[in-house]
Amino acid sequence: EVGLSAGLFYFPKYGEYEKYEASKRDISISDLQLVSWLLGECASVDDIKEAISKVRIISLDPQISTVHWRFADISGRQLVLEIIGGEPRFYENTLGVLTNSPGFDWQLTNLNNYVNLFPGAAPGQSLGVLRLSPFGSGSGFLGIPGDVTPPSRFVRAAFYQTSAPRQKTALDVVFQAFQILNSFDIPIGIEVATGEVAADIPSATQWTSVTDMQNRIVYFRTMYNSAIRSIDLNTIDFSSVQYHAKPLDRSKQQPIELSLIHI
Protein backbone atom coordinates (compact mmCIF):
# COMPACT_ATOMS: atom_id res chain seq x y z
CA GLU A 1 0.00 0.00 0.00
CA VAL A 2 3.04 2.34 0.21
CA GLY A 3 4.70 1.27 -3.03
CA LEU A 4 7.15 -1.31 -1.70
CA SER A 5 7.64 -4.43 -3.82
CA ALA A 6 9.36 -7.71 -3.00
CA GLY A 7 10.14 -10.88 -4.89
CA LEU A 8 11.49 -14.28 -3.82
CA PHE A 9 13.59 -16.34 -6.25
CA TYR A 10 15.04 -19.84 -5.91
CA PHE A 11 18.76 -19.75 -5.23
CA PRO A 12 19.89 -23.40 -5.06
CA LYS A 13 23.40 -24.42 -3.97
CA TYR A 14 24.70 -20.90 -3.40
CA GLY A 15 22.82 -19.59 -0.39
CA GLU A 16 23.56 -20.59 3.21
CA TYR A 17 21.39 -19.42 6.10
CA GLU A 18 22.19 -19.24 9.77
CA LYS A 19 21.52 -22.40 11.76
CA TYR A 20 18.37 -22.38 13.84
CA GLU A 21 18.99 -21.89 17.56
CA ALA A 22 16.10 -22.32 19.96
CA SER A 23 17.53 -19.67 22.26
CA LYS A 24 17.23 -17.12 19.43
CA ARG A 25 13.82 -18.12 18.12
CA ASP A 26 12.35 -14.71 19.03
CA ILE A 27 14.54 -13.02 16.41
CA SER A 28 14.43 -15.82 13.81
CA ILE A 29 12.26 -15.86 10.69
CA SER A 30 11.83 -18.42 7.92
CA ASP A 31 13.10 -17.55 4.45
CA LEU A 32 9.68 -18.24 2.93
CA GLN A 33 7.97 -15.93 5.45
CA LEU A 34 10.38 -13.03 5.02
CA VAL A 35 8.56 -11.26 2.18
CA SER A 36 5.21 -11.14 3.99
CA TRP A 37 6.85 -9.87 7.17
CA LEU A 38 8.89 -7.15 5.45
CA LEU A 39 5.95 -5.87 3.39
CA GLY A 40 3.97 -5.54 6.60
CA GLU A 41 6.75 -3.75 8.49
CA CYS A 42 8.65 -1.63 5.97
CA ALA A 43 8.02 1.25 3.57
CA SER A 44 11.38 1.54 1.76
CA VAL A 45 14.49 -0.44 0.91
CA ASP A 46 16.33 1.41 3.68
CA ASP A 47 13.71 0.14 6.14
CA ILE A 48 14.35 -3.37 4.83
CA LYS A 49 18.10 -3.14 5.43
CA GLU A 50 17.46 -2.02 8.99
CA ALA A 51 14.88 -4.75 9.61
CA ILE A 52 17.18 -7.49 8.27
CA SER A 53 19.94 -6.36 10.65
CA LYS A 54 17.70 -7.26 13.59
CA VAL A 55 16.67 -10.81 12.61
CA ARG A 56 18.18 -14.18 11.76
CA ILE A 57 16.96 -15.75 8.52
CA ILE A 58 16.63 -19.52 8.76
CA SER A 59 15.06 -22.43 6.89
CA LEU A 60 12.30 -24.61 8.33
CA ASP A 61 13.47 -27.45 6.09
CA PRO A 62 17.18 -27.63 5.18
CA GLN A 63 16.30 -30.01 2.33
CA ILE A 64 14.51 -27.21 0.48
CA SER A 65 16.46 -24.92 -1.83
CA THR A 66 17.68 -21.62 -0.46
CA VAL A 67 16.29 -18.42 -1.98
CA HIS A 68 17.33 -14.83 -2.57
CA TRP A 69 15.22 -11.68 -2.76
CA ARG A 70 14.64 -8.53 -4.81
CA PHE A 71 13.20 -5.41 -3.15
CA ALA A 72 12.13 -2.14 -4.80
CA ASP A 73 10.49 1.00 -3.48
CA ILE A 74 8.60 3.88 -5.04
CA SER A 75 11.81 5.87 -5.60
CA GLY A 76 12.92 3.26 -8.15
CA ARG A 77 15.76 1.98 -6.00
CA GLN A 78 16.21 -1.80 -5.97
CA LEU A 79 18.15 -4.13 -3.71
CA VAL A 80 19.09 -7.79 -3.93
CA LEU A 81 19.51 -9.76 -0.69
CA GLU A 82 21.46 -13.02 -0.54
CA ILE A 83 22.44 -14.97 2.56
CA ILE A 84 25.98 -16.31 2.05
CA GLY A 85 27.79 -18.16 4.82
CA GLY A 86 25.06 -17.14 7.24
CA GLU A 87 25.62 -13.44 6.55
CA PRO A 88 23.18 -11.15 4.70
CA ARG A 89 24.64 -9.44 1.64
CA PHE A 90 22.90 -6.52 -0.02
CA TYR A 91 23.55 -5.43 -3.59
CA GLU A 92 22.29 -2.26 -5.26
CA ASN A 93 20.42 -3.52 -8.30
CA THR A 94 20.72 -0.67 -10.81
CA LEU A 95 19.88 -3.01 -13.71
CA GLY A 96 16.61 -4.11 -12.15
CA VAL A 97 17.23 -7.75 -13.12
CA LEU A 98 17.35 -10.94 -11.04
CA THR A 99 17.01 -14.62 -11.91
CA ASN A 100 18.32 -17.58 -9.91
CA SER A 101 21.75 -19.13 -9.33
CA PRO A 102 24.63 -18.29 -9.36
CA GLY A 103 24.86 -15.21 -7.15
CA PHE A 104 24.02 -11.68 -8.22
CA ASP A 105 27.63 -10.48 -8.26
CA TRP A 106 28.59 -13.40 -10.55
CA GLN A 107 25.71 -12.56 -12.89
CA LEU A 108 26.94 -8.98 -13.19
CA THR A 109 30.49 -10.15 -13.92
CA ASN A 110 29.18 -12.56 -16.56
CA LEU A 111 27.71 -9.64 -18.51
CA ASN A 112 31.27 -8.75 -19.52
CA ASN A 113 31.21 -11.80 -21.80
CA TYR A 114 28.63 -9.98 -23.92
CA VAL A 115 30.31 -6.59 -24.28
CA ASN A 116 30.05 -7.03 -28.06
CA LEU A 117 26.24 -6.86 -28.03
CA PHE A 118 24.40 -3.66 -28.93
CA PRO A 119 20.89 -2.68 -30.07
CA GLY A 120 20.31 -2.11 -33.76
CA ALA A 121 21.91 -3.65 -36.83
CA ALA A 122 25.54 -4.59 -37.21
CA PRO A 123 27.33 -2.58 -39.90
CA GLY A 124 28.28 -4.28 -43.13
CA GLN A 125 31.90 -5.01 -43.91
CA SER A 126 34.07 -6.38 -46.69
CA LEU A 127 36.10 -9.56 -46.85
CA GLY A 128 38.36 -8.76 -49.76
CA VAL A 129 36.00 -8.20 -52.67
CA LEU A 130 33.11 -9.95 -50.87
CA ARG A 131 30.62 -7.56 -49.26
CA LEU A 132 28.91 -8.78 -46.09
CA SER A 133 25.61 -7.39 -44.81
CA PRO A 134 23.39 -8.28 -41.84
CA PHE A 135 20.42 -10.54 -42.59
CA GLY A 136 17.98 -8.32 -40.73
CA SER A 137 17.30 -5.86 -37.94
CA GLY A 138 18.54 -6.64 -34.46
CA SER A 139 21.77 -8.24 -35.67
CA GLY A 140 23.64 -6.27 -33.03
CA PHE A 141 22.27 -8.80 -30.54
CA LEU A 142 23.54 -11.80 -32.52
CA GLY A 143 25.02 -14.17 -29.95
CA ILE A 144 22.76 -13.24 -27.04
CA PRO A 145 22.01 -16.52 -25.19
CA GLY A 146 18.57 -17.92 -25.89
CA ASP A 147 18.30 -20.86 -23.48
CA VAL A 148 16.31 -20.86 -20.24
CA THR A 149 19.14 -21.25 -17.72
CA PRO A 150 19.33 -18.49 -15.09
CA PRO A 151 22.59 -16.94 -16.43
CA SER A 152 21.19 -16.76 -19.96
CA ARG A 153 17.89 -15.30 -18.80
CA PHE A 154 19.80 -12.70 -16.77
CA VAL A 155 21.78 -11.61 -19.83
CA ARG A 156 18.68 -11.37 -22.02
CA ALA A 157 16.73 -9.45 -19.41
CA ALA A 158 19.59 -7.01 -18.83
CA PHE A 159 19.97 -6.17 -22.52
CA TYR A 160 16.27 -6.23 -23.41
CA GLN A 161 15.11 -3.94 -20.63
CA THR A 162 17.97 -1.44 -20.94
CA SER A 163 17.39 -1.12 -24.69
CA ALA A 164 13.60 -0.73 -24.36
CA PRO A 165 12.32 2.74 -25.38
CA ARG A 166 10.82 5.02 -22.74
CA GLN A 167 7.03 5.05 -22.78
CA LYS A 168 4.62 7.93 -22.24
CA THR A 169 2.12 6.26 -19.90
CA ALA A 170 2.23 3.70 -17.12
CA LEU A 171 -0.05 1.37 -19.07
CA ASP A 172 2.28 1.54 -22.08
CA VAL A 173 5.13 0.50 -19.78
CA VAL A 174 3.06 -2.43 -18.52
CA PHE A 175 2.36 -3.66 -22.06
CA GLN A 176 6.03 -3.26 -22.99
CA ALA A 177 7.09 -5.20 -19.90
CA PHE A 178 4.82 -8.11 -20.80
CA GLN A 179 6.20 -8.11 -24.35
CA ILE A 180 9.75 -8.35 -23.00
CA LEU A 181 8.72 -11.08 -20.58
CA ASN A 182 7.37 -13.15 -23.48
CA SER A 183 11.01 -14.08 -24.10
CA PHE A 184 11.27 -15.78 -20.71
CA ASP A 185 8.36 -18.22 -20.78
CA ILE A 186 9.62 -21.72 -19.94
CA PRO A 187 7.37 -24.39 -21.51
CA ILE A 188 6.36 -27.54 -19.67
CA GLY A 189 8.45 -30.52 -20.71
CA ILE A 190 11.96 -29.17 -21.05
CA GLU A 191 12.57 -29.45 -17.31
CA VAL A 192 12.37 -33.27 -17.33
CA ALA A 193 14.21 -35.91 -19.31
CA THR A 194 12.45 -37.73 -22.13
CA GLY A 195 10.15 -40.40 -20.71
CA GLU A 196 9.90 -38.85 -17.25
CA VAL A 197 6.72 -37.33 -15.87
CA ALA A 198 6.62 -33.67 -14.88
CA ALA A 199 5.91 -32.85 -11.24
CA ASP A 200 2.49 -31.65 -10.07
CA ILE A 201 4.01 -28.17 -9.82
CA PRO A 202 6.15 -28.04 -12.96
CA SER A 203 9.34 -26.02 -13.18
CA ALA A 204 7.83 -23.92 -15.94
CA THR A 205 6.38 -20.43 -16.24
CA GLN A 206 3.07 -20.69 -14.38
CA TRP A 207 2.33 -16.99 -14.20
CA THR A 208 3.89 -13.66 -15.17
CA SER A 209 3.28 -10.41 -13.29
CA VAL A 210 4.05 -6.73 -13.75
CA THR A 211 3.62 -4.23 -10.91
CA ASP A 212 2.80 -0.55 -11.40
CA MET A 213 4.19 0.68 -8.09
CA GLN A 214 3.24 4.31 -8.67
CA ASN A 215 -0.45 3.56 -9.24
CA ARG A 216 -0.55 0.48 -6.96
CA ILE A 217 -1.82 -1.97 -9.58
CA VAL A 218 -0.59 -5.54 -10.07
CA TYR A 219 -1.06 -7.03 -13.54
CA PHE A 220 -0.75 -10.74 -14.26
CA ARG A 221 -1.36 -13.50 -16.78
CA THR A 222 -1.05 -17.25 -16.42
CA MET A 223 0.02 -20.32 -18.36
CA TYR A 224 -3.65 -21.13 -18.94
CA ASN A 225 -4.84 -17.65 -19.86
CA SER A 226 -2.59 -15.11 -21.54
CA ALA A 227 -5.13 -12.31 -21.16
CA ILE A 228 -3.76 -9.62 -18.84
CA ARG A 229 -5.73 -9.18 -15.62
CA SER A 230 -5.19 -6.71 -12.79
CA ILE A 231 -5.60 -6.23 -9.05
CA ASP A 232 -6.08 -2.63 -7.88
CA LEU A 233 -4.39 -2.42 -4.49
CA ASN A 234 -6.04 0.96 -3.87
CA THR A 235 -9.34 -0.84 -3.31
CA ILE A 236 -7.94 -2.90 -0.42
CA ASP A 237 -7.95 -1.64 3.16
CA PHE A 238 -4.73 -3.20 4.40
CA SER A 239 -5.38 -2.04 7.95
CA SER A 240 -8.34 -4.39 8.31
CA VAL A 241 -8.18 -7.03 5.58
CA GLN A 242 -7.44 -10.59 6.64
CA TYR A 243 -5.29 -13.11 4.81
CA HIS A 244 -7.06 -14.12 1.62
CA ALA A 245 -6.12 -16.49 -1.21
CA LYS A 246 -7.87 -17.50 -4.40
CA PRO A 247 -6.87 -19.36 -7.58
CA LEU A 248 -5.22 -17.35 -10.34
CA ASP A 249 -7.51 -19.01 -12.88
CA ARG A 250 -11.21 -19.78 -12.62
CA SER A 251 -10.78 -22.11 -15.57
CA LYS A 252 -7.79 -23.73 -17.26
CA GLN A 253 -9.27 -23.03 -20.67
CA GLN A 254 -8.54 -19.63 -22.14
CA PRO A 255 -11.49 -17.82 -23.70
CA ILE A 256 -10.97 -17.13 -27.40
CA GLU A 257 -12.34 -13.93 -28.84
CA LEU A 258 -14.14 -14.34 -32.15
CA SER A 259 -13.42 -11.60 -34.67
CA LEU A 260 -16.08 -11.09 -37.32
CA ILE A 261 -15.07 -9.86 -40.75
CA HIS A 262 -17.85 -8.09 -42.62
CA ILE A 263 -17.47 -8.10 -46.39
Sequence positions of predicted segments:
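A contiguous strand-loop segment
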Residues: 1-23, 63
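Secretory/export targeting leaders with adjacent low-complexity proregions
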Residues: 41-79
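Extended, compositionally biased non-globular segments
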Residues: 143-221
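Extended amphipathic alpha-helical segments with heptad-repeat/coiled-coil character used for oligomerization
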Residues: 63-119
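C-terminal soluble interaction/assembly domains
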Residues: 191, 198-203, 210, 217-252
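Long, charge-rich alpha-helical interaction segments
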Residues: 107-171
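Conserved small/polar residues in nucleotide/adenosyl-binding loops
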Residues: 261-263
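Compact, glycine/acidic-enriched structural inserts
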Residues: 13-55, 244-247
